[in-house]
């Protein structure tokens, strides 16, 4: 019987600078994507949605105002989220995060990330 050996070597994540902070991409392949989103206090990314991406967030540090649009009623909502909270975003769900604390961090697990799969509804720090 042949023995299977896996050689998992440590590596550095891929850092992507943003006006609101930065993303640290841990992995992005055809099965899944894992990222850390680290925010500057008072900054937010755009209100946007994805048609392909299904994402789940874990607030690992700090506090945010989480904003989303109910697409059936066209109503915008917002709520306070903090360390330990989780959010699941289905494809097509417009969403936005505003950091209330410096270094506020989200651990994101999702289906594969594609740059062309972000549709902006309102600008964020990177668009102004």
Residue locations for each model-derived region?
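Short glycine/proline-enriched turns and hinge-like loops at secondary-structure junctions
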Residues: 49-51, 58-59, 99-102
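Glycine- and acidic-residue-biased ligand/ion/polar-headgroup-sensing regions
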Residues: 52-71
């Amino acid at each position: 019987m042949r023995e299977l050996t896996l050689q998992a070597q440590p590596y550095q994540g891929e850092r992507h600078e943003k006006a609101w902070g930065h993303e640290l991409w841990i992995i992005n392949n055809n099965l899944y994507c894992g990222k850390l989103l680290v925010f500057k206090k008072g900054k937010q990314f755009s209100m946007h949605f994805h048609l392909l991406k299904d994402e789940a967030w874990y607030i690992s540090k700090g506090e945010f105002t989480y904003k989303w649009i109910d697409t059936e009623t066209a109503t915008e909502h917002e709520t306070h989220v903090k360390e330990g909270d989780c959010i699941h975003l289905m494809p097509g769900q417009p969403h936005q995060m505003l950091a209330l604390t410096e270094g506020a961090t989200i651990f994101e697990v999702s289906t594969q990330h594609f740059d062309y799969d972000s549709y902006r509804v309102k600008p964020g720090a990177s668009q102004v």
